[in-house]
Amino acid sequence: MIRDITIGQYYPVKSRIHSLDPRVKIVCTLLFLVSLFIQSSFLGYVIATLFLGTVIHMSKVPLKYIVKGLKPIVILLMFTVVMNLFLTRGGEVLLHFWIFTITEEGVRTSVFMALRLMHLVAGSSLMTFTTSPNGLMDGMEKLLSPLNKLHLPVHEVAMIMSIALRFIPILLEETDKIMKAQIARGADFESGNIIQRAKAMIPILVPLFVSAFRRANDLAMAMEARCYHGGEGRTRMKPLKYKGRDKAAYLITIIYVAGVFVLGKFVPFRVWIF
């Protein structure tokens, strides 16, 4: 389960999506995530799936990596579906048993929430799969650069966010190593109730925190050794510059979001339900 979390991992390969400006990927990902919350139709999610599937194909990231990232949220998905299925009221009653009632609106809401969560995770994972940590930091810093006029530490904020994302797979790998070492010593993380499992995690947390602080200290020393003193006066070997493909990506994403919005607002329910 730990190794299935893919957010923060980078998949190096040459593709059209990898070659896009990091700012384009960040903004387009945010627009895609926003579009998921204005979806109000099954057809809208079909279009979202086709859009995301096309981008995944163009990125050359294996589909198994995207699917792998969905495994950690299976329990959350099941919980969300069950809660919405039995607690949402409205529409025709499809099934009634004891105190449980399943309605048409409950089925619709549970399916929508499950699809939304899967698309959220897949879209976010794809951005980190196709954007290097340095590119991600440069893109965020450039997007937030107008805040420099307010004397906000934009470079430092972008650096912190980039390091935090980069540390996710590192800490997950470290957790996996510690768990395997504890299991080899006879530790049991699977049996027992919730409290017993929580207590069993204590031998993992202590060495994990020690390792995290050690890695953070090593990173700080490496940055100091390279005379890093923040973003002031710092130059880049490859300055970010928009190209034709970046503008095309913006245009395609805006058309997609606009189409989803129009579909949800102006197309009658019975037209798009199937």
Question: What residue spans do the PLM features occupy?
Answer:
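Loop-to-transmembrane-helix entry motif
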Residues: G69-I73, L77, A114, M118, ...
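Transmembrane alpha-helix interface motif
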Residues: M1-F42, A48-S59, S145, K149-L152, ...
